[in-house]
Amino acid sequence: MTGQRAEKPVLRVLGGEAVWPPPVWLMRQAGRYLPEYRKLREKAGNFIALCTTPPLATEVTLQPVRRFGMDAAILFSDILILPWALGQKLRFAEGEGPRLERIDGLAGLEALDPAALRQGTEPVMETVSRVRAELPPETTLIGFAGSPFTVACYMIDGRGGDFPLTREVAYADPALLAAVIETVTTATIDYLSWQIEAGADCVMLFDSWAGLLPPDLFRAHVIHPTARIVEQLRVRHPGVKVIGFPRLGGLMTLPYIADTGVDAVGMDTSVDPVALARLAPRRVAFQGNLDPLLLRAGGISLGQAVERIARGLEGHPHIFNLGHGIVPDTPPEHVAAVIERLRSLEPGELEESALAAT
C-alpha cells in the first residue's frame, strides 16, 4: 500500500487505527434522494445503462463526495451486474425493482458463461479508473460486490422479497444452491480483483440477506464463501482491505468476524455496537449503524443518535455509516446535518468512553 493510501482516514481505520472523528460515508449515498442523481438517471434512460455508461456512473459516484465531502466514494453499480455479465437476463421494472430470468436447475446455471465476465464488466472497471482519477487524494474509493449467498438469492428467485425459492432449494436441492454459490464466488474473486487493479483502495461485500439463514447454512453459504474471497483477494493483492456486511446476522456475526478474515464488519440497525465490540473474537473495525429512517426523519433525535454511536465506539476503529441504505425520500440537508454534527464532535476522555474496559 502506498504512503498516500495509508493517509486516507477510511484506510487508516481499516488498518486498525481509531480515528477521531470517525470517517464517514453512507450506503446508497449516490441515489434518488439527490436531485442531481435524478437528472442523470433520466438522461441514462434505464438503470442498467446508468450503471454501465462510465461517464454517467462516474458522475453519480462523485456526486455525494462533491456535495457532502464524504471520506469515501463507493462505486456506483449494482450487485446484479455480475450475474448479468455472466449471461443471466436482467431488467429493472419501474417501481418493482430488479427482475432476473430465474435459474431453476443446473441446466440454467450451466448456460451462464464465466468467460464473458471480463468483457461484461469492463464498463465497471472504466468507471473505477475514471473515479480514481477525479477523487481528492484523501478520499477512499471503495469497490464492491454482492456476497455469493445474496446474489444467489436473486439468481434463483428472480426478484427481491424474502426469497422463498432459494430457501427451499437450500433444503430440497442443496447441490443447486452450492453450485450457484460456487459460480458466484469464483466470479466475485475476479470481479473484485479487477476493481482493485482499476484503482479501488478497498472492497466491500454486501450480504444483505445473510440473516435469512439458520446457523449451519450461514456457515456454509455466508462464512465459507466470504473467507475464500478474502483469502484469494489477499493472494492477488497483499494487504488489501475488505469490509463485510452480514446484514441481520445476529449472533452469527461473531463467527463471521472470527473466520472470514474481513478487516471491518458493517452493522445493521439491530446491532448494539458497543456490545459487539466487546464480544468480538478479534479486533476488527466496525462500520455503521445509524437508522436510515431516523436519517429521513431528522430532528433532535438524529443529532443525538449520531453522537451516541460515535461516542460509543470512541477509541475503537470505526467508520460512521448507516445500518442499511439511504431511503429515496431522505432530505439531503439531513445528510449534511449528520456530517456537520459528526465532524463537530470533540474527542472525549477515552477512560470514560463506553469501550474503556475492553
From Swiss-Prot:
Keywords: Cytoplasm, Decarboxylase, Lyase, Porphyrin biosynthesis. It comes from the Bacteria. Its EC number is 4.1.1.37. It is an enzyme of class 4 (lyase). Its main location: cytoplasm. It is found in: Cytoplasm. GO terms for biological process: protoporphyrinogen IX biosynthetic process from glutamate. It catalyses: uroporphyrinogen III + 4 H(+) = coproporphyrinogen III + 4 CO2. InterPro entries: UROD/MetE-like_sf (IPR038071), Uroporphyrinogen_deCO2ase_HemE (IPR006361), Uroporphyrinogen_deCOase (IPR000257). It holds the Pfam family URO-D. The keyword Protein biosynthesis does not apply. Substrate binds at R28, Q29, A30, G31, R32, D78, Y154, S208, H324. Pathway: Porphyrin-containing compound metabolism; protoporphyrin-IX biosynthesis; coproporphyrinogen-III from 5-aminolevulinate: step 4/4. SUPFAM superfamilies: UROD/MetE-like (SSF51726). The keyword Zinc does not apply. Belongs to the uroporphyrinogen decarboxylase family. Catalyzes the decarboxylation of four acetate groups of uroporphyrinogen-III to yield coproporphyrinogen-III. Homodimer. This is Uroporphyrinogen decarboxylase. It comes from Acidiphilium cryptum (strain JF-5). The lineage of its organism: Bacteria, Pseudomonadati, Pseudomonadota, Alphaproteobacteria, Acetobacterales.
